[in-house]
From Swiss-Prot:
This is V-type proton ATPase subunit D. GO terms for cellular component: proton-transporting V-type ATPase complex. Subunit of the V1 complex of vacuolar(H+)-ATPase (V-ATPase), a multisubunit enzyme composed of a peripheral complex (V1) that hydrolyzes ATP and a membrane integral complex (V0) that translocates protons. V-ATPase is responsible for acidifying and maintaining the pH of intracellular compartments and in some cell types, is targeted to the plasma membrane, where it is responsible for acidifying the extracellular environment. Residues 214-259 are annotated as: Disordered. It holds the Pfam family ATP-synt_D. One of its GO terms (molecular function) is proton-transporting ATPase activity, rotational mechanism. InterPro entries: V_ATPase_D. Keywords: Hydrogen ion transport, Ion transport, Transport. It comes from the Eukaryota.
Length: 259
């Protein structure tokens, strides 16, 4: 039988059952490769979309922070230094961040959401003077906080998607360049071995038939050399005689008891 050991294949015994099993595994590997390829395409599409949003938000973040800085300068100019008032009134953070998970083709992406916990504790700040500027200041910084949380979500999703895409691409390449070729090499080996087994079986049957035919010819030649079989001596005479009755008693053989 042919070896095929030089190829990278699965160690199996060549049989019809193994061939059917390898065909099933090949079909499953091809289907898995197709699904992973679609998953990688979907992740790449979402990855490019997130990258575009990150660039846009960073540009917008610069403008929002610049506007918030100008609002802070205006509020300090009109209302004076109110930082000590804010610090004294702080008991807990008003803005909090909660996280939820978003499923994208089997990959869980973290999504951060900013929300205000409780009423505004600084409603009376700037009541004497500069109230409008302080209100505008709070609005601008609230917008900056929301934008920062959104940017944090995008950057976290960017990193998570980058790792998921790398893992998916490694799996796709492993199936395409390792698993499927191994199964195909195994199928080729099994088919080659089965064909060789069939050829050997056919040759063996032909050899047996040839030996039987040769033996019959030798027996026929031997019978021809010996001629017809001879009949046994007296065989014809005994055949012409009627069968002897063993119960009948011949008179000559009777014993003489009395004279």
């Amino acid at each position: 039988m042919s070896g095929g050991g030089g190829k990278d294949r699965i160690a199996v015994f060549p049989s019809r059952m193994a061939q059917t099993l390898m065909k099933t595994r090949l079909k499953g590997a091809q289907k898995g490769h197709s699904l992973l390829k679609k998953k990688a395409d979907a992740l790449n599409l979402r990855f490019r979309d997130i990258l575009k949003k990150i660039v846009e938000n960073k540009v917008l973040m610069g403008e929002v922070m610049k506007e918030a800085a100008f609002s802070l300068a205006e509020a300090k100019f009109t209302a004076g230094d109110f930082s000590h008032t804010v610090i004294q009134n702080v008991s807990q953070a008003q803005y909090r961040v909660r996280m939820k998970k978003e499923n994208v083709v089997g990959v869980l992406l973290p999504v951060f959401d900013a929300y205000q916990d409780g009423p505004d504790a600084y409603d009376l700040t700037g009541l004497g003077k500069g109230g409008a500027n302080i209100a505008r200041l709070k609005k601008n910084y609230n917008k900056a906080i929301e934008l920062l949380v959104e940017l944090a979500t995008l950057q976290t999703c960017f990193i998570t998607l980058d790792e998921a895409i790398k893992v998916t691409n490694r799996r796709v390449n492993a199936i395409e360049h390792v698993i499927i070729p191994r199964i195909e090499n195994t199928l080729t080996y099994i088919v080659t071995e089965l064909d060789e087994m069939e050829r050997e079986e056919f040759f063996r049957m032909k050899k047996i038939q040839a030996n039987k035919k040769k033996l019959k010819e030798q027996e026929a030649a031997q019978r021809a050399l010996e001629g017809p079989p001879k009949e046994e001596a007296g065989g014809t005479h005994s055949e012409n005689q009627p069968p002897r009755n063993l119960l009948a008693v011949e008179e000559d053989n009777l014993p003489v008891l009395f004279n």
